[in-house]
Amino acid sequence: CDWSSDVCSSDLGARIANACAALHLSLKELTVDCGIDILSFGGTKNGLMMGECVIIFNKDLQREARFVRKQSAQLASKMRYLSCQFTAYLTDDLWLKNAAHANAMAAKLYQALKELPEVTFTQKPESNQLFLTMPRPTIDRMLESYFFYFWNEANHEIRLVTSFDTTEEDVNQFI
């Protein structure tokens, strides 16, 4: 990270696909056009079994990056098995379709939850994550059946995240 911040502008893109889908922008518009030199293009949170793809947009940094990758232990012995997932992931914009679906499921969940008087959204819903508060007893009941994180336990703020495989039935059942 020190090398990255000293030499270039980088972005850790675990949810960059969701941002592209939500903003209706291309990956280029959210990276290269904004001055990003290196992107960790996330796949695990958007449908891949595992793996992130490091994309180096700045040609001057590409040669040195091969060595930095090894020094920071980011070279899996069977990299080709991890990498081959990206062929399908990038074909026909599957990465973008998965993200758009996750965002749509979050929007559906938001529309239902905003009608509940005990729910207050703490951040404007923009992608596949919802941040909200509700009474602690309600949260405790929900935790018996669903897994989610406290974002700020002091004020009962939780984070709900939808994904590429969240179905409308999942959302309806949660509601």
Where are these regions (language model features)?
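Single conserved hydrophobic/aromatic residue that forms the stacking wall/gate
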Residues: C1-V7
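Active-site C-terminal subdomain of aminotransferase-like
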Residues: A21-A22, S26-Q129
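A short, charged helix-loop
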Residues: A14-A22
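Conserved C-terminal alpha-helix-loop-beta "cap" of PLP-dependent enzymes
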Residues: A107-I175
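Glycine-rich nucleotide phosphate-binding loop and flanking beta-alpha elements
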Residues: A17, G47, T138
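General beta-strand structural signal in soluble alpha/beta enzymes
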Residues: C8-G13, L39-G42, T122-Q123, F150
